[in-house]
Amino acid sequence: MAGKEIIFREDARRSLEKGVNALAEAVKITLGPKGRNVVLEKKFGSPMIVNDGVTIAREIELSDPFENMGAQLVKEVATKTNDVAGDGTTTACVLAQAIVREGLKNVAAGANPMIIKRGIEKAVDKAVEAIKNSAKTIESKSAIAQVATISANDEMIGNLIADAMEKVGKDGVITVEESKGTTTNLEIVEGMNFDRGYISPYMITDADKMEATLNDPYILITDKKISAVGDLLPLLEKVVQSGKPLLVIAEDVEGEALATLVLNKLRGTFQCVAVKAPGFGDRRKAMLQDIAILTGGTVITEEVGLKLDKATIDQLGRANKVRVKKEETIIVGGAGSTDEITKRVAQIKKQIEETTSEFDKEKLQERLAKLAGGVAVIQVGAATETEMKDKKLRIEDALNATRAAVEEGIVPGGGVAYISALKGLDGLDAGSLDEKTGIDIVRRALEEPLRQIASNAGLEGSVIVEKVKNADPGIGFNALTGEFVNMIDAGIVDPAKVTRTALQNAASIAAMILTTETLVAEKPEKEKDTMGGMGGMGGMGGMM
């Protein structure tokens, strides 16, 4: 069995620092409007060209196990920031590297790392408070477009996301998909949609589009499998008398029940489309209830004592229009009461707040969107697959940044929010010299994002930082034009949530690295000499 290799004190910290630097140097060249790209090798297919911090960080694995630990810790800064805020991963890596670099200098000079850590935490809390206090709420479409434009570094993408948000609202779902063409466009799906299509192709009304359209239909919603026609007959007779079409949403429709529906459709007696209920298990029950509330119907389920053969026409839902495709059903203009829908939306929002599972949160968010607004799909097009992947990543980042901005407001971009937060550290009381050192480390680190943006634009970072520090509040450096401007007026803004999260995560991991004294890793196994057993072949000469 391979043993373990252990390194201590200064050697341990230096190895971690090398790993931190390796990852941060690769990521930070992408920061700002003049940031460069990174090319990632792929085992299959063409290399990937990206400008996204977390995607680059995820690809980095170092051969030295101790240095790799440092790189993996910074990777955690990037992924955690991405999970919470959806953007700001490069900034988080830059901040983490700065805190580690300054901190290790002081630890090597004899400072107590535990007390430095206390100073770092105190300063970060104060800086985060300053960032939150300076945040401005955003409402207008143009402000949303500015946030998205800065994140994606592309005005067209910014406007596209602002359009999508305007159409589906803050609670709406916006998904990003790869397009077949070369243009990027926005598609809005109005009403509630779910990924189940017609059970039988005989039910279609438009042979060219291969879809069924029902105008002003009744909607039967049940969690039961329908196979006996007797269960449906009493209800079918009432629907036929009304002269309206019928949409059946059930666990399944099969056997003679399906044959009866298809036969009536083909004879022209009445129009009916059957689809399977969306989702599985408890989620299916919840989604059927959502559809019932949206359409003003009742879920016919034996759990509450309702039987299909006793169902009345009053228990059916209504909608202005229903479109059923091969794999999708869209209900437009449900006749449900606005009060009931509002209550249901509030209930789902509460569940989103309480759930800890990311998967559940995502599914609840989808249900919320279908009830509250609709779904917007951004179709990403490009001339090559490599460009498309890069564009898709940028759009996803911009979308996350925009959601974060709507949630917690915006602050001046271009690293200016961190420079402004420096003033909040001025009167901070340090209990000891080492604690003051911790505060000063954060003070220096807060300048680093602006310094890096200027450096990527080919300028001397320290000069730009000093000019911004001495300028009026809100004035920053526009790296694209090389001018000093009011950042919010110029539309250079960052979401407060992204700015805050990047600093908190960077400080958390960096402080852990500073207080590390020992590293333990697997000892690499020496490769066995596979040719060693061939030595005995020298005796083959006597075989003649």
From Swiss-Prot:
Binding-site residues, ATP: T30, L31, G32, P33, D87, G88, T89, T90, T91, G414, N478, A479, L480, D494
Gene Ontology cellular-component annotations: cytoplasm
GO biological process terms, semicolon-separated: protein refolding
E.C. number(s) listed in UniProt: 5.6.1.7
CDD domains: GroEL
UniProt subcellular location: Cytoplasm
Keywords assigned by UniProt, alphabetized: ATP-binding, Chaperone, Cytoplasm, Isomerase, Nucleotide-binding
Principal subcellular localisation of the protein: cytoplasm
Annotated family: Belongs to the chaperonin (HSP60) family.
Function according to Swiss-Prot or TrEMBL: Together with its co-chaperonin GroES, plays an essential role in assisting protein folding. The GroEL-GroES system forms a nano-cage that allows encapsulation of the non-native substrate proteins and provides a physical environment optimized to promote and accelerate protein folding.
Protein name: Chaperonin GroEL
Organism: Pelotomaculum thermopropionicum (strain DSM 13744 / JCM 10971 / SI)
